[in-house]
Amino acid sequence: MAGRLDEDLKDVTLLGNQNTKYLFEYSPKILEVFDNNHPNRDYFVKFNCPEFTSLCPKTGQPDFATIYISYIPEQRMVESKSLKLYLFSFRNHGDFHEDCMNVIMNDLIKLMDPRYIEVWGKFTPRGGISIDPYCNYGRPGTKYEQMADYRMMNHDLYPETIDNR
């Protein structure tokens, strides 16, 4: 199979752009998609995002996390540079950890309409406690809905060694 044609990438405007503007306020409008060339098969796409930051909505203190985003695409896929810039836009966004993860998941569902998606934030401790919110979604009425239920019930059965924070 040949690579993608320029026509296939017409909606990808941020990748390769040397004049990238970093937004410091939450903005889902920056997200871009491209077509999935393999919609006839299930496969995971996973993003490991170790530099996520947001602000505590009460104190304004910065929060830091590694975020893991995994999804099974349908017709559209999120472009990685736009995802990076979107996550950066949380830098001055005041929200609780749990809210940030659900907002990210909801924005990606709206953007891509994936078969399945999960978002897991592993935040660095504040006050001696780390918070690791996990949320997922499987398309209703499909096997992915059952998959989401199963993964939710089994997502954290094995306690981790906290050595990366």
Curated annotation (Swiss-Prot):
UniProt-annotated location(s): Cytoplasm
Q: What is its main location?
A: cytoplasm
Q: Which residues form the active site?
A: 56 (thioimide intermediate), 63 (proton donor)
Protein name per Swiss-Prot or TrEMBL: NADPH-dependent 7-cyano-7-deazaguanine reductase
Question: What high-level taxonomic lineage is stated for the organism?
Answer: Bacteria, Bacillati, Bacillota, Bacilli, Bacillales
What this chain does, per the record? Catalyzes the NADPH-dependent reduction of 7-cyano-7-deazaguanine (preQ0) to 7-aminomethyl-7-deazaguanine (preQ1).
Per UniProt, substrate binds at 78-80, 97-98
Family note: Belongs to the GTP cyclohydrolase I family. QueF type 1 subfamily.
Tell me which positions the record assigns to the signal sequence: none
Enzyme class, top EC level, equals: oxidoreductase
Pathway assignment = tRNA modification; tRNA-queuosine biosynthesis
Give GO BP annotations, semicolon-separated.
queuosine biosynthetic process; tRNA modification
Query: What are the annotated GO cellular component locations?
Result: cytoplasm
